Structure formats: structure tokens, C-alpha cells
């Protein structure tokens, strides 16, 4: 849910440019580059370094480990049917059953089924729909403004949303815990300060019957390049009233 493809961070006493890959990914999708998102994680020390900060979920015909077929997992992964998460379990599909990575046909609106489940030690309080990479104000659901849409059990959110469309689009849903963290699971690890977050690969929508056409929108910023200077990034952020840090 970043507002720019980069930010200024500090390492020791020196400022540096950090690229926000998720934002760049959205820019790439708008330029027609179908790159699937996948989450990976590792550990570098035994103490104080959480393991499995991000995970990737892929649908399977069976929940029994011995019955899971690698051919099916490979096929679904190549099709982009993946959900990325730090904990929340997000499921999104269209009314006709199209999953992330798929292409479906719609006229002026799309029915989207969105479900979010969480274990007892984490929670989410926001569900945001991205339409062509931009955060839709109409589809920004929070516990504060839309308490009737959220629940307190394992199932946190279970709604069918109607998304109005005027052109071809790719849709991504983000489930987020703005007022929560992962400290219960990660303890003293720095990953404990991360937020519960889940999102999925885009669902592509064809509104005019000629397939999906990307809109070319780079979301207000040029695609980041290597060795961008701190001053150049600060200048770009200041022009759009975006915080530099």
C-alpha cells in the first residue's frame, strides 16, 4: 500500500534510496508485463531472526500432504494462482470462479468474493481493493468506518463486492492489519514489528471483448532506475507531496 516506488532510509548516519518492489510490480503490470508475485523468506541468525516472515499459498485439490501432487502445484503456480501473506489467509475469486492470475469478462461491473481468515494471535482491520494498481477510495473497507463488514472470529471478512469498471483492469485485494503487529509470533525478532498483510496476484478483467489491455499508468512516478540519488528521489517525492521517509 505504498504511495511511491521508493523511499529514503538511513543506514548508520547515511541516507540511502530504498526501492519498494511491490509498487514497482504494480507499475510493471500496468505496462503489460505479466510478472507473478511470490513471497519467500529466510533466516540469517539463530536468535532474534524470525523464520517464514512471508509465505506463498497455492490452491490444492487436497489438504492431505501425502495427496498433494507437484504437477498440480506447478501448474497453478505458473498460472499465477498465488496468495502472499505474513499471516492472514486471503481468498479472492470472481463470481464466475476466476482465481488470481486468471482473465475474466465483465461489462461495467465485477462481482468479487473476498474472504479473510486469521489465527487468534493476529487480526486485520482493513481490506483495500487496488484497481490497476491504484487504491480505490470507494473500496477501502476499515473496521472503523465499516464495522458491519468485519467479524471477530477466525473469519474476519466475508463479503461479495461489486467493483464498477469503465475500462480493462487488473484487480488486487489487500488484507491489512493497520493497528496490529506480529510480535506474538515473532517475539524479539525485528519481524515482530511487521503488519499482518496478505495480497494476491492480479485478476485481469476484459471489459470490451478483445482481451486485457494494460492502461500504461506508472502511478505518478517513473520506473525506478539503478543508482538513483537521494536528492533526485527527494525531489520526486516532494513534487507529489509524498513523505520522503
Annotate the PLM regions.
Residues 9-12, 22-245:
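C-terminal functional module detector
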Residues 1-19:
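Active-site-proximal segments of metal-dependent phosphoesterases and phosphodiesterases across multiple
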